[in-house]
């Protein structure tokens, strides 16, 4: 699976 959830994406 692709780790594109919100591990490094914090607005």
Curated annotation (Swiss-Prot):
One of its GO terms (biological process) is neuropeptide signaling pathway. Its main location: secreted. GO terms for cellular component: extracellular region. Signal peptide: none annotated. It is found in: Secreted. FMRFamides and FMRFamide-like peptides are neuropeptides. This is Extended FMRFamide-10.
